[in-house]
């Protein structure tokens, strides 16, 4: 199939967007959250585990910058680092996520400690960061194109959570509101890089696999949370109720 003619830019973009059928907005865990069926523990578990993803996104973006020789791309991509880490004197997305944690009843220090992060979530996120470090900068950049589907998921939370979960402090929704605009901006840049770089059929098919890899990461994170918070089968549940799993190994 890789010997076939390349897709046109419009066809390639359509194929990328079709991957939205596998975006984690369709995972039963997410469906339960925006339908109002999630428990307090399930929402807290999601916020705590997703924090590990949030704090690693700047590491992913820094790896892309380190591998990218194109100054113009770096000048634009660095905004993603500032979005999450914050510019000097300004809070970024990580601080906004800590406020979301407080809004759902979690202590910021507990979030920072990562003691609630499930091994399956940690492994998935670490795989993403390691991919960004080892792949070409174009491949790592294009893996971010799950952002094609991100505005919908942020909007679904803003539309449904205040109605279903009045116990959540509305101040915590700042992160979702901010990301609506940032994600749309990031998509334009990431999509432009992708459509320009992948001009052969083999390259386009590889990119679709890379996007599926990223979708697998997001879905696997929720699978781990489903086991722990929906099925009450966290790691080692058959031998202990304690959170004995590792809290991250620094190399």
Curated annotation (Swiss-Prot):
Pathway: Cofactor biosynthesis; pyrroloquinoline quinone biosynthesis
Reactions performed catalytically: 6-(2-amino-2-carboxyethyl)-7,8-dioxo-1,2,3,4,7,8-hexahydroquinoline-2,4-dicarboxylate + 3 O2 = pyrroloquinoline quinone + 2 H2O2 + 2 H2O + H(+)
The keyword Oxidoreductase is assigned to this record: yes
GO terms, molecular function: pyrroloquinoline-quinone synthase activity
Keywords: Oxidoreductase, PQQ biosynthesis
Gene3D superfamilies the record matches: Heme oxygenase-like
Transmembrane segment boundaries: none
Pfam family, one: TENA_THI-4
Cystine bridges: none
EC number: 1.3.3.11
Gene Ontology biological process terms, A to Z: pyrroloquinoline quinone biosynthetic process; sulfur compound metabolic process
Annotated signal peptide: none
InterPro entries recorded: Haem_Oase-like_multi-hlx (IPR016084), PqqC (IPR011845), PqqC-like (IPR039068), Thiaminase-2/PQQC (IPR004305)
UniProt xrefs under HAMAP family: PQQ_syn_PqqC
Functional summary from the UniProt entry: Ring cyclization and eight-electron oxidation of 3a-(2-amino-2-carboxyethyl)-4,5-dioxo-4,5,6,7,8,9-hexahydroquinoline-7,9-dicarboxylic-acid to PQQ.
PANTHER family membership: 4-AMINOBENZOATE SYNTHASE (PTHR40279:SF3), PQQC-LIKE PROTEIN (PTHR40279)
Family: Belongs to the PqqC family.
Protein's UniProt name: Pyrroloquinoline-quinone synthase
Organism: Pseudomonas putida (strain GB-1)
């Amino acid at each position: 199939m890789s010997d076939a003619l390349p897709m046109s830019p419009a066809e390639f973009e359509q194929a990328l967007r079709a991957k939205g059928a596998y975006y984690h907005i369709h995972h039963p865990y997410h469906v339960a959250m925006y339908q109002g069926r999630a428990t307090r523990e399930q929402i807290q578990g999601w916020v705590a585990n997703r924090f590990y993803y949030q704090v690693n996104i700047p590491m992913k973006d820094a790896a892309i910058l380190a591998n990218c020789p194109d100054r113009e791309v770096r000048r634009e991509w660095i905004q993603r680092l500032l979005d999450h880490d914050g510019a000097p004197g300004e809070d970024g997305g990580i601080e906004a996520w800590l406020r979301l944690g407080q809004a759902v009843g979690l202590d910021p220090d507990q979030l920072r400690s990562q003691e609630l992060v499930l091994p399956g979530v940690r492994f998935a996120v670490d795989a993403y960061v390691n991919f960004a470090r080892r792949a070409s900068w174009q491949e790592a950049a294009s893996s971010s194109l799950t952002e094609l589907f991100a505005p919908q998921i942020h909007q679904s939370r803003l539309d449904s959570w205040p109605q279903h979960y009045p116990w959540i402090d509305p101040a915590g929704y700042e992160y979702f509101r901010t990301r609506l605009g940032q994600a749309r901006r990031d998509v334009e840049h990431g999509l432009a890089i992708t459509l320009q770089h992948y001009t052969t059929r083999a390259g386009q098919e590889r990119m679709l696999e890379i996007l599926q890899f990223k979708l697998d990461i997001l879905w696997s994170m929720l699978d781990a949370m489903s086991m722990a918070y929906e099925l009450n089968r966290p790691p080692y549940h058959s031998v202990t109720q304690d959170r004995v799993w590792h809290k991250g190994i620094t190399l």
